[in-house]
Design a protein with these regions (language model features):
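Aromatic/acidic polysaccharide-binding cleft in carbohydrate-active enzymes
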Residues: 1-119
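C-terminal beta-sandwich/jelly-roll accessory domains of carbohydrate-active enzymes
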Residues: 100-221
């Protein structure tokens, strides 16, 4: 449906990444319909976010689902590990890229209302749980040395246009400057740290909130 607020939420980002990880070794190319809400615009609403299923809003603001594709597009050509929540790849000999998610599926409450009647404020109660996921990625046979670990994260607080829209009171009549502000603040959080390998093993720990997606870039310094 193009009138479902979950299309704009972190849920959709985690859902997209989950499906891309499941199928990334089964297809050469994976497409998505559709790129922008411009192609599913409704004349009876002036809302900035009305639940369109595009990766971008009609004003060009990036949704969590957009970042799911962007993160996955940063993966290398050689898959070195994969499970239900993550995939790790190598690009050359110096860089490893990991994509991971903490997808949560619907509970019974989701099916009790029409898709176009779901309220933004009540999304959290429509999933099986909202528990965090502690994840450890163990990279073997790496060169001895120091590595830079860069984590891009999209969650309820960062890279989430719904959260930024809420901060301005769900206001719709925005001028150009205000719209550009929303575009600029809807960005993934970036974490940086350095870590040494031990006996050819590099262990990377991260925590993902419910419906959070991450792209972890590991580069030898």
């Amino acid at each position: 449906s193009n009138r479902n607020v979950l299309n704009v939420s972190c849920f959709k980002g985690a859902y997209v990444m989950k499906n891309l990880i499941q199928n990334c070794q089964n297809a050469d190319v994976i497409g998505y319909w559709l790129a922008s809400d411009l192609f599913s615009d409704y004349y009876d609403t002036k809302e900035i976010l009305y639940g369109g299923c595009g990766l971008l809003t009609k004003d060009g603001i990036r949704k969590p689902s957009y970042y799911a594709f962007k993160f996955m597009n940063a993966l290398g050509g050689q898959c070195i590990g994969k499970n239900e929540n993550a995939v790790a790849t190598r690009s050359g000999s110096k860089q490893i890229s990991i994509c991971c998610h903490n997808y949560k599926h619907f509970n019974f409450r989701y099916y009790l209302v029409e898709e176009d009647e779901i309220e933004v404020e009540r999304q959290a109660g429509m999933f099986e749980d909202n528990e965090r996921l502690q994840m450890t990625v163990r990279l073997k046979n790496v060169e001895e040395g120091t590595y830079q670990i860069k984590i891009y994260s999209v969650n309820q607080e960062f890279g989430n246009i719904q959260n930024e829209w809420e901060k301005i009171g769900y206001y719709n009549d925005l001028n150009l400057e205000e719209m550009e502000y929303l575009k600029s603040v809807t960005q993934p959080k970036i974490y940086l740290r350095q870590q040494k390998s031990v006996k050819g093993i590099l262990e990377i720990e991260t925590v993902l909130g419910a419906q959070e997606i991450q792209n972890i870039i590991v580069t030898e310094i």
